[in-house]
């Protein structure tokens, strides 16, 4: 398998360390990475597909999977009849998901976050407002998960005044996972303003599950001392928070 991308590392919208580490994992699994170059043409030759890159290289294979993202479909659905003017990014909405008088929009069509769980969240916000229960949508703690093996996950800010990283191998050797996972390059990085968590990125088995501790901490603005005093179950990957928070405390006190 060959993975071709136009950026210098995978997951270009996340901190570089996450994309680089994921790339190393994929390469260990035998996937060839061809980065910082774009595909410009494709053709069929007999039973093979041929993909040509802008630097002249060609790759042959049985299948080509093109991942180009998606765009909100707002044309020809009658928006003009209800006084709504969509932009290239989608249908503009306010914090209560209102697109206009007695009109609401949720999900990908808003162009805000093209994630299923965000669409569900927006649906709950819209439903509450429709029922006369004022509620606003907030996006400071949106979890983002890439379901590779291992999983890559992130939430909140992508940088901050203070940061600390803990390797998953510090705790995985005691967890109920295989030794292969324990020896992986998985990690947890926390970002902070000095008082609370503002962001986190993680790589490792089921990272989309244990990133949720950071999601809740950011959403609820939980003070760092409270997080540091939280008991983590043994043996689990969640113990990596203890190491990361200890390092974060040292960075803040330095």
Task: Identify the residue ranges that each predicted region occupies.
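Cofactor-binding loop segments of dinucleotide-utilizing enzymes, especially the Rossmann-like FAD-
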Residues: 6, 108, 202-203
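Rossmann-like dinucleotide-binding cores of NAD(P)H-dependent redox enzymes
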Residues: 1-48, 115-120, 128-160
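A short, glycine/Asx- and small/polar-enriched loop/turn
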Residues: 44-49, 100, 182-185
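Flexible, glycine-rich terminal cap/loop adjacent to redox cofactors
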Residues: 136, 147-254
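Conserved beta-strand-loop-beta-strand element in the redox core of flavoprotein oxidoreductases
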Residues: 43-58, 64
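FAD-site-proximal beta/loop scaffold in flavoenzymes
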Residues: 58-129
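Residue-level signature of catalytic and energy-coupling elements of molecular machines
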Residues: 26, 79, 123, 195, ...
């Amino acid at each position: 398998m060959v993975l071709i991308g136009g950026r210098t590392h995978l997951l270009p919208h996340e901190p570089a360390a996450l994309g680089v580490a994921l790339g190393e994992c994929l390469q260990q699994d035998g996937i060839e990475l061809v980065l910082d170059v774009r595909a410009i043409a494709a053709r069929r030759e007999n039973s093979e597909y041929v993909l040509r890159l802008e630097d002249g290289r060609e790759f042959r294979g049985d299948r080509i999977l093109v991942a180009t993202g998606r765009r909100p479909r707002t044309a020809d659905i009658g928006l003009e009849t209800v006084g709504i003017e969509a932009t290239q990014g989608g249908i503009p909405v306010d914090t209560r998901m209102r697109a206009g008088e007695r009109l609401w929009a949720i999900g990908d069509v808003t162009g805000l976050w093209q994630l299923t769980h965000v669409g569900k969240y927006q649906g709950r916000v819209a439903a509450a407002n429709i029922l006369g229960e004022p509620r606003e949508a907030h996006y400071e703690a949106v979890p983002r998960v890439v379901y590779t093996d291992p999983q890559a996950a992130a939430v909140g800010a992508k940088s901050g005044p203070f940061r600390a990283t803990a390797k998953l191998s510090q705790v995985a050797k005691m967890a109920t996972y295989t030794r292969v996972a324990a020896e992986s390059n998985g990690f947890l990085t926390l970002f902070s303003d000095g008082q609370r968590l503002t962001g986190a990125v993680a790589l490792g088995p089921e990272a989309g599950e244990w990133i949720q501790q950071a999601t809740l901490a950011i959403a609820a603005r939980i003070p760092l001392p409270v997080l540091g005093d939280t008991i983590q179950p043994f043996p689990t990957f969640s113990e990596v928070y203890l190491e990361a928070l200890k390092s974060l405390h040292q960075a803040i006190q330095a």
